[in-house]
């Protein structure tokens, strides 16, 4: 279970992924698409469905991801947490949650694709960090929550192998930093021959 964090200011310092900005943008785009394709098929009677994050319904999960996307343009634009303030507090879904997601996701993706965006510094609550590190954390969140959402609505929960591989490569060396942070449930054991998606989910406290 992930902690209920809306503000990216609470992301964990120290992401050890060694891949470069081009790989980040590719992985981020794919993770965004994976989450989006599940959002687009949420039925009207599924908003209260539970998800693998036991404290979150489908609507709660989407609220979290919409909030994260709304923060991206101002943070990549150099704004501080205090400057953004309470702008994105409260309900960001309104009467049309899918449209709210589509708008926020498109604006976030455009911000990432701006020339030089991945080379910037973002101002988070724990201090300044690279946009690349922030981007990998957002990519991880999108990918893992795509699986959560798929489970919540009974959709296909398979993630692309290459996306699972790159996110697993980012998560594995960092998981010890997150122990006791409340960001994720403790890692789960998997068999030696488990596929990469199963390994990724298990590291983040999820059983496939």
Model regions: which residues?
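Structured surface interface patches that mediate subunit assembly and partner/cofactor docking
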Residues: 2-37, 41-54, 74-208
